[in-house]
Amino acid sequence: MKKIYFTFLVPIFLYSQNLEELVNLTIENRLVESSKQNLDALKDEYKSVQRGYLPKLDAGASYSINEHEYPSTPKKRANAYGSVNYMLYDGGKKYDIYDGYETNIKSGEKSLDALKNNLSLTVIQYYFDYLSLEAKKDAKQKEIEQLTAQEDRIGRFYNAGTTTEDELQKIVSRLQNAIVELQEIELNIITITHNLEYITGTQVSITDGSKLEDINNLIQKNPRFDIQALDFVTQSKQSVAQAQKSGYYPTVTLDNTFNYYDNNYDKFIDTDSNNHQNVASANMKWNLFSFGQTKYQYESKQKEYLASRSNFEYEKNKADVDLQLALKSYNIAKAKIKSTEATLKAAQSAYEIIKSKFENGLIDNVAFLQSLTEKYDAISQHKKAINDLEVKKATIIYHSGEKLQEYIR
């Protein structure tokens, strides 16, 4: 019997997770992994661009056979060459491109943090909603137990002819409604569980006991992660706009090419004793007039930058308002806990009195049923208020630009 008991416990133990474990699973899911790969791809692209500005070494060879031979055109010719090319100056575009990539990478990193925080907040909401539903389920089950007991009690009185059928049917009706409500609660619990399994990518079984750290001393040091990402995107667009100005300046390249060739004549004598040639050159190119092409390219990118800056300022102000609303919501949630606690005490006290009067035949079952419902509703509402406070704390941490997983205990 002990072996069977242990066998049933093992799966529960293996798949049971608290809030910290659920969040850790979530921030390593496939969506996050996809974002990481995109960020790595951007970093590799930046490395490629950097390498593109280093000297380039090329080599090549050719072999040709001509139909007609002339003194300057051998019958057969072999050629091999090697060349080195270096962009000495590109009008300053290189450094603006570098700045653009670096800020884009920083934006990608902050976007990744924002994604993790968004997912973490979603999991936290699911977790505490799950606990609230479990508390509501427990209260509803106890209400059903009370209603079932009263159904048996009133049923005996009805069979004895000491009470009317409508008194019994009121209890039966309330019991059936409570059973349906319990089924709806269980469906909501299953829905949350499935949503968590979808986000985490694994089977979950939730354990309670997790909370978030106190936030009374929390100071906002940085904007929200997505706002930081927008800021870096804006900086990147500014760098791209500045890069367009390079069209006003010259480009300078350095080249060195070494050629080796072997000429084979059938009819003529090769009079050229040299079989190699080395050419070193410095080249400058300066576009003096292009009908305003560079001007309009710059203005186009500058307008994109200004649009991005306006969007950033708008979202930043909106995020500041969201934080202030979250703080007010948190204070209301704390007050709600005190309110529901007082309501619970009053409901429990009233229920005990009304139950005693009902069982002694001093009042009808309408008042009793109302009192019973109010008691268990008060229990579930109080526990929900406690759980909602944790969600409010998480929302403040989220809007304060902090990583949620660091505040779970």
Where in the sequence are the language-model features?
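Acidic, low-complexity, intrinsically disordered peripheral segments
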Residues: 381-409
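Sec-dependent N-terminal signal peptides
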Residues: 4-13
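Periplasmic alpha-helical coiled-coil/stalk elements that build and connect Gram-negative outer-membrane
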Residues: 21, 116-228, 233-235, 241, ...
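Membrane-embedded beta-strand positions of outer-membrane beta-barrel proteins
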Residues: 35, 57-61, 230, 252-256, ...
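Small/polar, glycine/serine/threonine/aspartate-rich low-complexity segments that form flexible
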Residues: 60-93, 97-99, 256-293, 297, ...
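Bacterial Sec-pathway N-terminal export signals of envelope proteins
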Residues: 16-58, 162-166, 197-242, 249, ...
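A glycine-/polar-enriched beta->alpha junction
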Residues: 27-31, 43-55, 82-100, 110-117, ...
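Short, charged, amphipathic alpha-helical segments
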Residues: 99-102, 165-176, 299, 365-376
